[in-house]
């Protein structure tokens, strides 16, 4: 199955059929293990990363290798961007060398500029407002754990950040209702919320217990970038928005806990939750590999 969009920048580009197709493909790839088939033989992925990365970098590089392709890691200091070359010129030049670009950037406008200038597909590996690759892995993990997506209810606790924004789009596409508990000043993008409310029930609250009540999945993320910690920002969330055992008891008995990682135990989540029996975070992390392999195939590169 080939998706309609050239690029994946926010998650809104994918409809229900496309997301389910990617998930089904990812599950097949995971079950199939290391295949001798190399559908991306001769293809090259450029990884343009302005920010540090563990899961995104390694999962894309390993995924391309397993599919028979190559991945080139391009940190800021290794590119002429650091010496004043424009983003459009860089994107146009890279398009002549590689088959797909993954960019991990500070400002979302940068990924939009890359996509507008590149003639090859561009994937958002994380920006300040969206993280669509994470949501494909999340939805795959939920499907594995719950056996379905439509009709479930999710709770997001903490910061209405880039992951939350893309999660809203993903939930809207597959029919998962969601309650988002954040401080009033840290809510997700209003336009994203309004769009998703056309398809699903989206509740916004400042009360984590209200959001978690009866939830099938409980999500959280760091309250500030782990590479650029803002202690004053963190204090606006603690201890009220920490996911702990009492909060998980508000959720459904068979609820799962999810976190995109990296995590700060004792900050946004207690160790007994992230390391406990309800935690799906390690499946979630592994599924970055499988879902992104499926995405690369769906882009038709």
Curated annotation (Swiss-Prot):
Keywords: Amino-acid biosynthesis, Arginine biosynthesis, Cytoplasm, Transferase. GO terms for biological process: arginine biosynthetic process via ornithine; citrulline biosynthetic process; L-arginine biosynthetic process. Disulfide bonds: none annotated. It is an enzyme of class 2 (transferase). L-ornithine binds at residues 162, 221, 225-226. It is found in: Cytoplasm. Pathway: Amino-acid biosynthesis; L-arginine biosynthesis; L-arginine from L-ornithine and carbamoyl phosphate: step 1/3. InterPro entries: Asp/Orn_carbamoyltranf_P-bd, Asp/Orn_carbamoylTrfase, Asp/Orn_carbamoylTrfase_sf, Asp_carbamoyltransf_Asp/Orn-bd, Orn/put_carbamltrans, OTCase_ArgI. Coiled coil: none annotated. It holds the Pfam family OTCace_N. One of its GO terms (cellular component) is cytoplasm. Reversibly catalyzes the transfer of the carbamoyl group from carbamoyl phosphate (CP) to the N(epsilon) atom of ornithine (ORN) to produce L-citrulline. HAMAP family: OTCase. This is Ornithine carbamoyltransferase.
